[in-house]
């Protein structure tokens, strides 16, 4: 249906079942629903992604998904705050049919969603949350996302010797993935 304001859907996955009865990977939901997704690697990124995610959602007129994992969702840390945004004025949609889930309306919205995929990919390619870091040893390339990136960097406090692609925003940044593949042996 799209949105007329910012909307972030947060899914908290539980890898290794620390506090639930099953493991899930909600990244598949982002891919399946064709909407952008964020995956923070630390508390500051979680804060920044929520802050920027609301603005991005409002700009594109679609919800965005944010994937958290147990270790991050159950943690606390100080964060550097950003300026508070002014409250938007409430208004009714010019076309309320957009929010009525009937096949005729859904097909129109689906077409719009498909047309926006290039915009979502471009946003991901240019996102500061996706970062390629070169390394001197090209025998291995590492792709890390979310808190897994923090675990990687804990093992390399002086910097990783291998090229690393940190993923924080989806759809996957194909140009950066290709750069990693072409760089490594």
Enumerate the language-model features and the residues they cover.
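Thiamine diphosphate
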Residues: 1-58
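Flexible, low-complexity linker and terminal segments
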Residues: 40-185
